[in-house]
Amino acid sequence: MATPSSIPAEPKRDVVNRIHRVTRGNRSLWYQMTVLQQPERARACGSGSKANSDRRPVDPPPVVELRIIEGPSVEEGKDITFDYNANFFLYASLEHARPLARGRVNTPAAGNPPILTGVPASGMAYLDRPTEAGYFIFPDLSVRHEGLYILTFSLFETTKEERDFDLEPADGDLPPGVDYRMEIKTDPFSVYSAKKFPGLMESTQLSKTVADQGCQVRIRRDVRMRKRESKPGAGNSNSGGNGFERREEDFGRRRTITPASEDPHSIRNRSHSNSSEQRTPYTDASRRPSMVDSYPPPPPPPSYEPAPSASRHLDFGDSSAAQYPTPRQYAHQPGLQITPGPPSGSYAPTAQSPYSKTDAPYGYVNRNIPPSCPSPAPSVKHDLYDRRQSTSSYVPPSPSVYSTEGHHRRDSRPSYPPTPVAAPRPRPMHSQTSLPALKIDQLVSPVSPLPPIEPQTGPAPELPPINVGGKRKHESVFAQSTRPLHNGQRQVDPHYGRSHRGYSPDHDQGWYSRADGQISSVQFNRYYDE
């Protein structure tokens, strides 16, 4: 039976534990176990329904090394770990680092709570690095409750050859061929709650070396530690010391802040509503974003175009008349012919009104028009303003029949139906009458400016009712009786009022039903055979 040579009461980091046993074949074997990687911290996973899905393994994962030496002593013996024909497995158990005080009520659940979860057993892996030996790795160990704990590893051997059995029979509780060999304990480590857990550290070099050789070990390339401000008077002797502070500083340097937008003048995305559009104070009429501003623009102010002559003999008054800007010029509508007016020097000026009163042709009713000039047509476009030639460089031709006829055609507009208007239109002129010349000093005078232009509105003409087609009602076509029917009576149909529909006693007369439901008769022609 194996007897432990020395079991220290308080094992330290990288503590070596050895035992010696003699087999039935008189072989002297030495078992040496070393904890190469001690656990430092863990996060409590609790015991609720989410305990299994939200587990945090012990960090770093514990790693235990096993060597088997054959010889009179360890120093003089030979390492036969790879040549020894047996199976080994290591079982981990969790214990409190300090004994707990017993309470008044002792229950089995309180005495032995299930505080260790995960995979507590590990088989031996034969690795070449860091040295040729057998290694036990525990990458999936979790603790349910916070506190200070230690791990105890128990080594069990399954002997395959009879010469390697013990001299004395082993414990009867174990199956035949399975023997308990030795145990070793780790250093105390802390288990934190979810709020106090400082985070996981970067994987150690030993974990990376073991993982490179095919063992299932989780490797973390970055630091996952939570940076917390140290409170005065709050110290933990088992916090890890300098390694903790160094990793927290590295983690603090790597943390970054979400960068702000590079363009501070960028405009946010447009809303789907029409009222939230970003408009400038003066927008172009041709670029309206929606139906909010789709009303037609107001009519432009009237333009007074002087009729220049080649001799330039008209007097424009004193120098103060220069303060009036040149009126805006508008292009004529498509389809309308515009001809220049007669020269201003051929007619005598009038003082009452710039327009002479004439009879309206083609049945137009005479209407009293005030001296104010009518407004031009509002349907103009900005892109046509500059296409019209300047009146200062235009020489009008002499008045003729063609010019007056074209002017009459422009004003009469017989091809358009009458529509209600908001502003008065120019009076139509007869082909045989002409307008007197306009005097500029009467239109533009610094002493008596023109009165404001006001639109004249009149009652809209009543349009005749439009006959809208539709289906006739059933009552207007088919006569129905509302009296009750008894004893098998049926509704009287006027189409079947006679005994034989379409026939009459008179052979020269026939009856038929019209589309509106009325019964009509027709006379047939009489043909006699001679």
Curated annotation (Swiss-Prot):
The lineage of its organism: Eukaryota, Fungi, Dikarya, Ascomycota, Pezizomycotina. Belongs to the velvet family. VeA subfamily. Disruption phenotype: Impairs the production of gibberellins, fumonisins and fusarin C. Reduces both the fusaric acid gene cluster expression and production of fusaric acid. Affects conidiation associated with stunted aerial hyphae. Component of the velvet transcription factor complex that controls sexual/asexual developmental ratio in response to light, promoting sexual development in the darkness while stimulating asexual sporulation under illumination. The velvet complex hat acts as a global regulator for secondary metabolite gene expression. Controls positively the expression of the gibberellins, fumonisins and fusarin C gene clusters. Controls the expression of the fusaric acid gene cluster. Controls negatively the expression of the bikaverin gene cluster. Regulates the expression of laeA. GO terms for biological process: sporulation resulting in formation of a cellular spore. This is Developmental and secondary metabolism regulator VEL1. Component of the heterotrimeric velvet complex composed of LAE1, VEL1 and VEL2; VEL1 acting as a bridging protein between LAE1 and VEL2. Interacts with LAE1. A motif (Nuclear localization signal) lies at residues 40-45. Induction: Expression is repressed in media containing high amounts of nitrogen. Residues 295-305, 415-426 have a biased composition (Pro residues). It comes from Gibberella fujikuroi (strain CBS 195.34 / IMI 58289 / NRRL A-6831) (Bakanae and foot rot disease fungus). Residues 244-253, 380-389 have a biased composition (Basic and acidic residues). Residues 26-220 form the Velvet domain. Residues 390-404 have a biased composition (Low complexity).
